[in-house]
């Protein structure tokens, strides 16, 4: 019950595209994205360091790198326009920064869906303290 309460409190603080990103992951993986990926491996969730643990974690590593290349807005707080058309995620913003954030999320959601077979529950709630190897460069 305590875990459910913590997740509920955390979700009330989710704004902008992080909730949108969660929605994209939900559609592409069939999972509750924010819960399934929030502390997965070394890169899914807040921060990231070390070596990605599997292909799923690598999707998050690439997503972090993509966010790092966005200029002109805060990727974690920006709200963008997108839709689902015939199972595809379509980014719809004219603003270059918002479109870039949406594209980062779109690519990561597709990657997560394509790598569901590598998702390993042993990496759920993974501690960054276990991510000791040298971090890769983007």
Curated annotation (Swiss-Prot):
- Write out the annotated subcellular location: Secreted
Q: Which GO terms describe its cellular component?
A: extracellular region
Name the positions where Ca(2+) binds. Answer: 43, 45, 47, 64
Highest taxon listed in the record's lineage: Eukaryota
EC category: hydrolase
Which cysteines link up through disulfide bonds? Answer: 42-131, 44-60, 59-111, 65-138, 66-104, 73-97, 91-102
The main location is secreted
The record's Pfam families line, in alphabetical order, gives: Phospholip_A2_1 (PF00068)
> Could you name the active-site residues?
63, 105
Per UniProt, the cofactor note for this protein states: Binds 1 Ca(2+) ion.
An example molecular function term from Gene Ontology annotations: calcium ion binding
Q: Which organism is it from?
A: Macrovipera lebetinus (Levantine viper)
Q: Could you confirm whether the keyword Lipid metabolism appears in this record?
A: yes
Which cofactors go with this protein?
Answer: Ca(2+)
Q: Where is the signal peptide?
A: 1-16
Described by its record, this protein's role is as follows:
Snake venom phospholipase that inhibits ADP- and collagen-induced human platelet aggregation. This inhibition is completely inhibited by abolition of catalytic activity in case of collagen as inducer and partially inhibited in case of ADP as inducer. PLA2 catalyzes the calcium-dependent hydrolysis of the 2-acyl groups in 3-sn-phosphoglycerides.
Documented EC number(s) = 3.1.1.4
Q: What is the name of this protein?
A: Acidic phospholipase A2 2
């Amino acid at each position: 019950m305590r875990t459910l309460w913590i997740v509920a409190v955390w979700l009330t603080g989710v704004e902008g595209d992080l909730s949108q990103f969660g929605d994209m992951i939900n559609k592409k993986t069939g999972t509750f994205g924010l819960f399934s990926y929030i502390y997965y491996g070394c890169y899914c969730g807040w921060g990231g360091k070390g070596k990605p643990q599997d292909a799923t974690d690598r999707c998050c590593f690439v997503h972090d790198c993509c966010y790092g290349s966005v200029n002109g807005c805060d990727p974690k707080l920006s709200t963008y326009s997108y839709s689902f058309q015939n199972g595809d995620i379509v980014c719809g913003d004219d603003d270059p920064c918002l479109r870039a954030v949406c594209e980062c999320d779109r690519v990561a959601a597709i990657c997560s869906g394509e790598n569901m077979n590598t998702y390993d529950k042993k990496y759920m709630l993974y501690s960054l303290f276990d991510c000791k190897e040298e971090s890769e460069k983007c």
